[in-house]
């Protein structure tokens, strides 16, 4: 058989080859469509597990809503249980970065966990978005690869103290919170703003994070007109029950974790009257929150709180940043810049943006715990708009003072 090829057949074959070759040119775009790897550091055991479980639920609700896609890329999700301790957080962070090769990490939950991994995250140049509220990560020792879309430790406590002094007319308050960084920084923020408004902190009590019986501390609560508690996880439940059982009647104020919406199903009437300040509230009327509430009810049959909403919002930020960066995640410095430039108008908590340290600026809500139609609810009574981590203080002067600690500010005699 002749192997001669006619000119017409040659031209047709060449043209077909050219078309075939042309489809091979966009290889970088195809490579960039590789799965986007999203990691989560959370807590599934111990006293902080209440919040940690809701963190993962918030992520799962978002991913389901988006059909497991972000910016045109399929999402591979990796969840790690830190056990709620610094060593566990560091080990799991290293596994997510070095073994799983994640593009972005969400979490961890606790301030002491964040402090344990912040240097490693900066060295690994892996973007980290966290609810963990350790203040100096966005203040005196800023991490360029960190972003916080929820609140730093004292951010809710500044408006809470303002409200306690001006609206509740409290004058002499005793504070009580767990004996670790989040507790110190919450109470420090409350104390500074409360004292600036003419109030006085009589004493500060620091029970360990695992305290089955608060009786020795409750015995020290006397001769005041209010109490500020800063407990997290399931500890607010135990504290409020024991507080009422001890016959204490002083009004109690708290931050986002101490009066979380997710605890309402487990609180009893002893919590009625609890006043809290939070960057998220379930009674917020916006379309994003309505969708979020419906999805959480459908998938998990729960009322979401600060932890679930916070992780859902973090996912919104990741998606928006990835879109701003053209769907690319290989250059982590560019991705981080895109993430920090995000501002959102539609989230379950309302509009948010970030300051130049990577901490959120947004609305904070004062809620009063009430009983309506046989159910406990947090009813919003006041909104503080565009609250930053520096409250109304001058940023430069604020950063010149020490980070809030067990002893700063000191109790004045």
List PLM regions with ranges.
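N-terminal secretory signal peptides and thylakoid transit peptides that target proteins
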Residues: 1-18, 24-25
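C-terminal segment of N-terminal export signals and the immediately downstream linker at the start
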Residues: 25-44
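Extracytoplasmic "Venus flytrap"
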Residues: 39-58, 62, 80-86, 109-110, ...
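Beta-alpha junction/loop-to-helix N-cap segments that form part of ligand/metal-binding clefts
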Residues: 50-55, 69-140, 207-214, 237
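Extracellular/periplasmic Venus flytrap/periplasmic-binding protein
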Residues: 91, 135-137, 144-247, 282-291, ...
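Periplasmic-binding protein-like
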Residues: 96, 100-109, 129-131, 174-177, ...
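Extracellular/periplasmic ligand-binding modules, especially the Venus flytrap/periplasmic-binding
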Residues: 189, 233, 238, 283-342
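Solvent-exposed, acidic/polar segments of extracytosolic/periplasmic ligand-binding ectodomains
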Residues: 343, 347-413
């Amino acid at each position: 058989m002749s192997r001669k090829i006619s000119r017409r057949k040659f031209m047709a074959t060449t043209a077909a080859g050219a078309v075939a070759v042309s489809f091979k040119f966009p290889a970088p775009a195809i490579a960039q469509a590789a799965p986007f790897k999203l990691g989560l550091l959370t807590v599934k055991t111990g006293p902080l597990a209440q919040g940690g479980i809701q963190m993962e639920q918030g992520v799962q609700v978002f991913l389901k809503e988006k059909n497991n896609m972000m910016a045109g890329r399929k999402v591979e999700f990796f969840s790690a249980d830190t056990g709620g301790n610094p060593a566990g957080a560091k080990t799991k962070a290293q596994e997510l970065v070095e073994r799983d090769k994640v593009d972005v990490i969400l979490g961890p939950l606790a301030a002491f966990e964040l402090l344990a991994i912040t240097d490693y995250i900066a060295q690994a140049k892996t973007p980290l978005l966290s609810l963990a509220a350790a203040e100096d990560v966005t203040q005196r020792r800023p991490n360029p690869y960190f972003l916080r879309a929820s609140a730093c430790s004292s951010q809710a406590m500044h408006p809470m103290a303002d409200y306690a002094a001006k609206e509740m007319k409290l004058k002499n308050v005793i504070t009580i919170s767990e004996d670790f960084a989040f507790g110190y920084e919450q109470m420090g923020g409350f104390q500074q703003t409360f004292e600036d408004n003419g109030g006085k902190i009589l004493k500060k009590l620091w029970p360990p994070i695992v305290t089955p019986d608060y009786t020795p501390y409750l015995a020290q609560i006397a001769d005041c007109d209010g109490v500020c508690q800063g407990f997290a996880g399931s500890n607010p439940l135990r504290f409020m029950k024991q507080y009422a059982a001890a016959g204490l009647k002083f009004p109690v104020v708290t931050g986002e974790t101490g009066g979380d919406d997710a605890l309402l199903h487990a609180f009893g009437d002893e919590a009625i009257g609890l006043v809290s300040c939070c960057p998220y509230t379930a009674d917020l009327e916006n379309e994003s929150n309505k969708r979020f509430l419906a999805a959480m009810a459908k998938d998990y049959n729960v009322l979401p709180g600060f932890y679930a909403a916070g992780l859902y919002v973090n996912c919104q930020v990741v998606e928006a940043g990835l879109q701003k960066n053209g769907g690319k995640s290989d250059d982590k410095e560019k991705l981080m810049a895109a993430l920090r430039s995000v501002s959102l108008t539609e989230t379950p908590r309302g509009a948010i943006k970030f300051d130049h340290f990577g901490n959120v600026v947004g609305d904070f809500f004062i809620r009063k715990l009430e009983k309506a139609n046989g159910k406990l609810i947090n009813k919003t009574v006041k909104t503080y708009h565009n609250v930053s981590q520096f409250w109304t203080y001058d940023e430069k002067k604020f950063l010149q003072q020490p980070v809030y600690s067990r002893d700063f500010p000191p109790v004045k005699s």
